[in-house]
A protein has these predicted regions:
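Acceptor-binding helix/loop patch of EC 2.4 sugar-transfer enzymes
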Residues: 47-50, 97-129
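Carbohydrate-associated surface elements
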Residues: 147, 167
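Short N-terminal targeting/anchoring amphipathic segment
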Residues: 66-83, 88
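Conserved donor-binding/catalytic core segment of Leloir-type glycosyltransferases
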Residues: 4, 177-201, 205-209, 217
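N-terminal subdomain of nucleotide-sugar transferases
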Residues: 1-44, 206-209
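A short, charged, and often flexible helix/loop element on the N-terminal side
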Residues: 40-67, 115-120
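Nucleotide-activated donor-binding/catalytic signature segment of Leloir-type glycosyltransferases, i.e.
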Residues: 218, 226-239
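Membrane-proximal helix-turn-helix segments that form the acceptor-binding/catalytic region
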Residues: 62, 66, 118-141
Length: 239
């Protein structure tokens, strides 16, 4: 069996994207252990479609179909509900989709916060419509959390849902010199890629100020870090 895995979530079409590629590589390596062949690609290298930041890719599907004809997969696995998935459905290839979170809540939150203008709200609506077409016509949706099944069924009643368990491969861990922490301290391990979640870090402004003898360390990064760091870095006990 041959599985084509397309990485798109988290990276988008921005230059230098990383997305969730690393985790999908580990998934593919696990498939190889049960004698399943896989090919992992960045989906935006082959097709983008509308709406996206790459107008040149709105109408071109040649790279996508060249990939399909060359690799001839038995099934396709994607982590982004976009045009790669839609074209897979049109090509008649079994499609499986990986859903990491509450997509509908994330879209509504984005409309109320960072994408309030009409243009971006329209883009979000189009992307959500594409995603729902993918969910409706795919062979299965893999979820990272049990609660998502009820969420998905609320919007896509006939969806076929499967639980996808993620794990850590400790053989990949390696020792590294740590930083010297000043005590007492609090460690924050969280990314800054979803604004409706990331904005909660701003409540630390008053907390850090009220606890000058406690050091706060943030281990994280993301597209909204520049909205958070200017607020928190003014405190000498934030690192």
């Amino acid at each position: 069996m041959k599985i084509l895995i397309a990485s798109g979530a988290g990276g988008g079409t921005a230059k230098g994207r990383i997305g969730k590629y690393f985790h999908l590589k580990e998934f593919g390596d696990a498939l190889e252990k049960i004698d399943v062949d896989y090919k992992l690609v960045h989906e935006f290298d082959y097709i983008t479609g509308f709406p996206s930041k790459s107008p040149k890719g709105w109408f071109s599907k040649k790279k996508f179909y060249d990939l399909i004809n060359e690799y001839n997969p038995d099934a396709v696995f994607v982590d982004w509900q976009s045009h790669f998935a839609l074209e897979t459905i049109k090509a008649g290839i079994p499609l499986f989709v990986y859903l990491r979170g509450h997509l509908w809540m994330e879209v509504e939150s984005a409309k109320k916060t960072i994408y309030k203008d009409l243009k971006m709200r329209t883009v979000l609506n189009l992307r959500l419509k594409n995603a729902e077409r993918v969910f409706t016509n795919c062979q299965g949706i893999f979820m990272t959390a049990d609660y998502l099944e009820d969420v998905i069924k609320e919007h896509i009643p006939n969806a076929r849902c499967y639980h996808f368990l993620e794990g850590l491969d400790t053989t990949r861990w390696y020792p590294a010199p740590g930083m010297k922490l000043e005590h007492p301290c609090v460690g924050l391990v969280v990314d800054a890629n979803m604004w409706h979640k990331s904005k909660e870090m701003l409540v630390l402004d008053e907390v850090i100020q009220a606890m000058p003898n406690v050091h706060f360390y943030w281990a994280g990064d993301g597209q909204y870090k520049n909205k958070i760091l200017p607020v928190l870095e003014k405190h000498s006990n934030f690192h």
